[in-house]
């Protein structure tokens, strides 16, 4: 997943993304580091918040 790149492209901070996803900033940090992944059921919402498709979200980091 390339969440960090997509987040930066969307002009969001980790805190802003966390608020939009109803999680804490630490969760976003763990997603970006690859320590954990967002739940499958939240992929669609995350893609919408980041302004991308689910396919773009799930692509390996570039």
Regions from the language model: what does each represent?
Residues 21, 25, 61:
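Short, small-residue-rich loop/turn micro-motifs
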Residues 56-62:
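Short amphipathic recognition helices of helix-turn-helix/homeodomain-type DNA-binding modules
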Residues 13, 24-27, 39, 53:
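Short coil turns linking two alpha-helices in DNA-binding domains
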Residues 22, 41-56:
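DNA major-groove recognition helix of helix-turn-helix/homeodomain DNA-binding modules
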Residues 2-20, 45:
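Short basic helix-loop element that most often maps to the first helix and adjoining turn
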């Amino acid at each position: 997943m390339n969440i960090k790149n997509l987040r930066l492209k969307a002009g969001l901070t980790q805190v802003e993304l966390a608020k939009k996803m109803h999680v804490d900033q630490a969760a976003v940090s763990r997603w970006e580091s690859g320590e954990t992944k967002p739940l499958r059921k939240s992929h669609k919402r995350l893609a919408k918040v980041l302004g991308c498709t689910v396919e773009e979200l799930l692509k390996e980091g570039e």
